[in-house]
Structures are given as structure tokens and as C-alpha cells.
Amino acid sequence: KTAYYGLFSMQHRGQEASGISASYNHQIKTIKNRGLVTEVFDNDSFEILQGQMAIGHNRYSTAGSDSVLDAQPVSAKYSLGEISIVHNGNLINKHEVRERLIEDGAIFQSNMDTENILHLIAKSKKENLQDRIIEALEQIVGAYCLLILSRSKMFVVRDPYGIRPLSIGRLKDGGYIVASETCAFDLVGATYVRDVAPGEMIVFEEGKSAFKSIELFEAKDPRLCAFEYIYFARPDSMIDGKNVYQIRKKLGEILADKSSCKADFVVPVPDSGVPAALGYAARSNIPFEMAIVRNHYVG
């Protein structure tokens, strides 16, 4: 249930669909569907999704459609066995890559750029999965955080610019958890270890207590998506060592310094705007009021 609780704690990152793949007894089982985490999974799901390794995904569509075919994880059988992939990001050369793959005979079942990566891995002639992943990544350009699950290993990759966040936590039983936000660690009682570095691959292997780190690409100048700090992330998360709530509040203070005004109240647009409004109100000595109330169960 660790993967389930992790997805539940990050429901804010996507509400269209949810899915989990788990590796058990040299088989990968996947359950995914449209809807919230609590709507997709039940007790019967946990009976199916057994194992020591699992990956999960909440969908917020930036590419593809809202069809269940575009829900993740994306799983397939290929010459080396089975794999399942989840991807947070966007590939800017997805159309060129897809056209080339189709010309080579690939058949696509979804509109997701994630499926491009799956085909590149399957098409590779490298002898092991790790080398196939590396070869595939050399052909894509854009933002990506990837979790790739095989029957006995899990590969974690962050793009060279670190556009999307990705962190590693340690569970109380000695296992590891990887998530886009550290708020997922809190719900399962995990402690923060470190962020996955831009351009880094982390390899977890079943039965081994330590993970392996590989520098795939030289890290570029950090280009973390600005929307993570101001909108996407939960305020209690840490991203690249910085607390999201404190960053938002500080931005409000800076705005008050640079663009002060006479006003009766400082009113936030909930929910992401609340910390910034608090910072603005405190710095400008203008009363803070919740004049806009959001209904969390509509829209």
C-alpha cells in the first residue's frame, strides 16, 4: 500500500487518472483507470498488486487525451521481459521521434509521449535494460522524471536540467521511496534522503539494501519549472532543499517591496496563492482576508 498512500498524498498533482504497477514473482501487474486514487483502487487491488517494488502515477494531462489508454503506468512485454514506465514531463521532440518509430514499424496505442520511450527501449539492440534506457534517453529532448520497473529492478532518471522535481526517501523498514514531492514521505513515515540530481540515474535492485547512482548526463544550469514553487507543489513539500510554503511567502514579501499599493485587504486566490498573500500582507501591513472561498469538490 506504500505506492497507494504516496499517490494519495500527491493527488493534487493530477486528478484525471491513477495507476500502479507492481513486480512480484517475476511478473508485473498493473491497475489503472480514470478517476481519483480512492476511486481507482480498493482492497481487491491490493491483493493483485503485491510485491517488493512498485511504481505509480497520477495523471495531469499535458500531452495526449483523457482516455484510459493515456493513463500511466505504461506496460509492455518485449524481448528482455516486461517493463512498466511512469513519466512526469514533456518531450519537445516527441513528434519527430514518433514519426521515425512508425516508419520503422512501431504501433502506438496512445497519444502519450511516454510511449515513445517504451518503443525506443524495446527497439534497442543493447544486451541489458540499463543500456537500452540510456540509448533511448540519448534520443529524447525535454523535461522528464522517469521510473522504469522491470521484474527485478527499478530505474529512476531525472533530465539534465532538473525541470521536474524528484526526491528519494527512506522507509522505516529500510526500503526506499521515490516521489515528485516529499509530502509523499510524510504519509508513509519515510525520511528524506536527497534529491535525484539532474542527469542522474538511480538503480534499485530487489534484495539489495543500497542503490546505485550513475551520472548519465552532465548537469546543465538548473531549470526547475517555476510553476512547481508557485502552483503545482503542496506547501509542505521540500523541492531542491527549499520549503515550498516559505518560498511562496517570500515571493509575497518581495512583491510587496517592489509593488506596494494602498488597499483595504490582501485577498488570496486559494489555495496556492494563500502563502504569497500572507507574505504580502505581513510586509505591507495590510490586513489579510479570505474573501474568496474555494469549493474543493466542484471543478
Predicted regions and their residues:
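Conserved short alpha-helical segments that host acidic/polar catalytic motifs at enzyme active sites
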Residues: 1-198, 203-264, 269
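Short alpha-helical
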Residues: 92, 274-275
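ATP/NTP-dependent adenylation/nucleotidyl-transfer catalytic domains that generate, transfer
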Residues: 250-253, 275, 296-297
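Short, glycine/charge-rich flexible loops or terminal/linker lids adjacent to PRPP-binding catalytic cores
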Residues: 285-299
